[in-house]
Amino acid sequence: MTPLAYSKQGHLRFRRKSPSNISKSPGEHLTEEQLQALHADACYAECLLQRAALTFLQDENMVSFIKGGIKVRNSYLIYKELHTFIQSNSSLQGPNHIHLEGGVSFGIGAFNLTLSMFPPRLLKVLEFAGFSGDKEYGLSQLNDGATTNNLRSMLCALLLLCYYTFLTFILGTGEGDVADAEKLLKPFRLRYPQGAIFLFFAGRAEAIKGNIDEAVVLFEDGCKAQQQWKQFHHMCYWELMWCFTYKCVWRMAYFYADLLSNESRWSKAMYVYMKAAYLSMLAPGEARPFGEDEVDLFRQVSTFKQKIAGKSPPTEKFAIRKARRYKASCPVRLPVPVLEMMYMWNGFSMISKRPELTEGMLQTLVEAERILLESPANEYSMDDRCVIHLLKGLCLKNQGHIRAAEECFNKVYNSEKKIRFDHYLVPNALLELSVVYIDTGRKEEAIKLLVKAKTNYKEYSMESRTQFRIHAALSKLKADTSDQDEITPL
């Protein structure tokens, strides 16, 4: 934060005293001092964005959260004014103009692209506050910034890669934009063959394509490429953990969850939960690594609860709720906690192109279902059965068994009144059933289910993520449902 503060103060010295300083008649050139002030404005807006991001990540009180929001708005207004100017006849095409354009493309593109992902009702509120979100325009601005030789081309490229390989995948319907990501990556991979960040995104692209072994190699190479930035290693560990999850290699996945729990401060509760979850997937008599016990680990999860901007992250809340049953003296085990969390990160889409990986998951679910049916009924029985039905439906959909997948999703929906704890299951079952309808051309039926999932269910686990996916599915159908949109902030 301190270097950013110094940078911000430095740019303040060169900034314009008032907005009118850039108003010129057509053909009238700006002075060198005025041009310098415009570049300082772009740098200042960028600093505000970065400081806001750090505020959201580091500080844990509402006052700091509000301050971060003010920085974001001030940054946006500066970018908006600069964008208006460079589009005007007054804009001077000097030797450094391309760098100013790159900075403005980054800011305008980032705001438009990010805000376009919000559902219409929330976007209307943001537009009232002076923001706007246009996905296509945001993408075009970032592409312009990434493909021209300017100081912000790298930032534009990295933001696009995040969008193509993470945001569209995790908050969308699970496709990702791999072709666009690889096209963008190609020149950077040639220029920086050992660039850690580009190895990471290349690994992410391979994982989305279902090439899990290739992804593992790239993530491992990314770790080897640099040793200074440990947080980057943690990003790779997280991806490696999921890669081994897709392969059902529980011990290796546990190994990376253990590394994260020991080294990373991002979400200790999540890492401990995943460690316990992986151990629970091992056979009862199988030796546990480091002598750890999953029941003890599940009981520890809530002790690592944290708050960001006054609230716990949704993924932590979910993990704590799921682990709560282990507080009992004779706890009822979770049937497939790893696969349930994998669903929350859209992991079943990762294995959709790999029949053998989907089959491995399906067999794990079939065995868990057998154990559940043979066990005495308890207060969690119906919820656990519905978890398995939802996940089996995803596997069957991946295998092309559409009718069987629909039956699984409908079983969850029809059990709505019997579900006691996992209320997220029904809206997600409706979402997945609608995706099946979209894939099979039943557009009107899909829209009805999506609207029902969006409007009839509130205050369930991971609601924001589900609502974003619903919005993405509706956008895919180009359905105008702005009057019914509701969302809980992430």
Regions found by a protein language model. Name each.
Residues 1-187, 208, 220, 228, ...:
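Short coil/linker segments at helix-helix boundaries
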Residues 4-12, 91, 151-156, 196-197, ...:
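Boundary/linker segments of alpha-helical solenoid repeat arrays
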Residues 298-301, 308-383:
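Extended repeat-based solenoid scaffolds, especially LRR ectodomains
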Residues 36, 43, 47-50, 100, ...:
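"A position-specific structural signal for the A-helix of alpha-solenoid helical repeats
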Residues 215, 221-224, 238-239, 259-263, ...:
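Active/binding-pocket-proximal capping segment
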Residues 424-484:
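C-terminal interaction modules of eukaryotic adaptor/scaffold proteins
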Residues 161, 207, 237, 378-426:
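Alpha-helical adaptor scaffolds
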Residues 181-286:
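A compositional/structural signature marking long, glycine- and acidic/polar-rich segments
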